[in-house]
Amino acid sequence: GAVACCGRSAVARGVACSRVPHVTLMRDTGDMKISADFTVMPDDFAKAAAPEYRTDGVPVISFPFYIDEIDPAARYLHWAFTDPDSIPVCGFEWIHWPVANLPIDALMYDFNDSHALQIPPDFSRQLPSMIPETVQGRTSAASKLVGSTNPQVTMRYNGPQPPDKDHDYSLHVWGTAKPLPGLNQGFWLNELFHALRDVDHVTDQGVMFITGKA
């Protein structure tokens, strides 16, 4: 699987969340493990995607991944798929896919699968009809520097298309006991960060990195 980063969450250490500074809750890596069946993003989800897997030239079929060892107190999932390696290229971390308020109970469990939860391929495009209460945020395609106005691109998964060399993409997933308030379809990523800092029920989190080929 992809490289997964895991540690001890405040809850797992027995520290009351209300007594931990908000920024610590957000930044301290939890017990949750995020993984995939690949370390390099497959073509269908990235720069080499076929025309039928693109919208306005952008790969829009989201990749599958697994979430394991989730804190039992977690009831909702939120994530941000971003490209830190875009910073030297364009001056900021490119936002590829923010998601918030995904109810864990809405995900199907396969008791024959060794993984606790699986996010299936093409989940981004299926979400509005499958789980309408879950919201997807704006990608960097919505920025004034890019100017896309198509919501199928600005508020859906955008696959890796590094222009200069291979980039390592970050998928950061958080678990909370309750939904995050104030987030609507098309939220900006900073709004997700503010919401995570402003609540006292962030129970767990995990990160993995996937390489996108140039």
Please report, for each region that a protein language model flagged, where it lies by residue.
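N-terminus-centered regions that define maturation/targeting leaders and the start
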Residues: 25-214
